[in-house]
Amino acid sequence: MKVVIMGDSDTVVGFRLAGIHEAYEFDLSELSIERARNKLKELVERDDVGIILITERLAQKIGELPQVNLPIILQIPDKFGSIYGEELLREIVRRAVGIEVKR
């Protein structure tokens, strides 16, 4: 199964360098967001896609993401960092690992 990345050009270039061959660049313009929505719908329907990585900012602009078991859709931070902040990350780690991370 393939891993696909959707996001801004800098994030996409980084993942291409890491070996992800199917990568789609989008900016945050209205037209580009609509193209991203359509591409996401297309990717979700494909049988050969196992994981879709999408930047948090793009996912936020797209709106509600499809609720599917496969492919797995993971939101990732872009070059500016997470839009959800450290507090959410701490909570996720606390739930997953069972310990609280403090600075």
Swiss-Prot record:
Assign the protein's first listed, main location to one coarse class: membrane
Q: Give the UniProt entry's GO cellular component terms.
A: plasma membrane
* GO MF term list: ATP binding; proton-transporting ATP synthase activity, rotational mechanism; proton-transporting ATPase activity, rotational mechanism
Q: Which domain of life is it from?
A: Archaea
Q: Which InterPro entries match?
A: ATPase_V1-cplx_f_g_su, ATPase_V1-cplx_fsu_bac/arc, ATPase_V1_fsu_sf
Recorded hits in SUPFAM superfamilies, A to Z, give:
AtpF-like
Q: Which UniProt keywords apply?
A: ATP synthesis, Cell membrane, Hydrogen ion transport, Ion transport, Membrane, Transport
Subcellular localization, as worded in the UniProt entry:
Cell membrane
Q: What does the entry give for GO biological process?
A: proton motive force-driven plasma membrane ATP synthesis
UniProt membrane topology term: Peripheral membrane protein
Per its database record, what is this protein's job? Answer: Component of the A-type ATP synthase that produces ATP from ADP in the presence of a proton gradient across the membrane.
| Quaternary structure (record) | Has multiple subunits with at least A(3), B(3), C, D, E, F, H, I and proteolipid K(x).
What does the sequence similarity comment in the record state about its family? Belongs to the V-ATPase F subunit family.
What HAMAP family would the database entry show? ATP_synth_F_arch
Name the UniProt record assigns to this protein: A-type ATP synthase subunit F
Q: Which organism is it from?
A: Pyrococcus horikoshii (strain ATCC 700860 / DSM 12428 / JCM 9974 / NBRC 100139 / OT-3)
Q: What is the lineage of its organism?
A: Archaea, Methanobacteriati, Methanobacteriota, Thermococci, Thermococcales
User: What gene codes for this chain?
Assistant: atpF
